[in-house]
């Protein structure tokens, strides 16, 4: 009850935002679970501590995921046209399902685990420490400029691979 009173739900630029006041300490609970239902979901911006799980599937045209937090984002049974992931935090982003186009960008420590997300076209860039695993059926544009590596499943006929860091790019 006390935790709920500290939470805020607001609408900003047609976006519903859920937050907890940083000045108030949330203590003495083992696990907090927040359930959200929505007719559409086009973006997830995760900047806190904890995990985001979508277990029962998500179908959307476009999905933007921004992860700057200390925790994981896990989406099972995703179906979308265009997926854009920006991982700049410590936690991992794990995706399963299908997408026409998947843009996966890692600048943080966490990994992007999208080996079970079949995408026709994949653009993957690793500029941090984290690794990217993806699955490309038609084309892949992969670039490594850091320590992290890019591993891709599938047999894409169109490949553009660029390595300027310590990391590797490899078909698995």
Segments (PLM) and residue ranges:
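Short, acidic/turn-prone active-site loops that include or flank metal/cofactor-
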Residues: 1-2, 166
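Extended, compositionally simple hydrophobic/Ser/Thr-rich segments
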Residues: 26, 33-36, 41-172
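Mid-chain, structured segments of secreted extracytoplasmic proteins
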Residues: 2-41
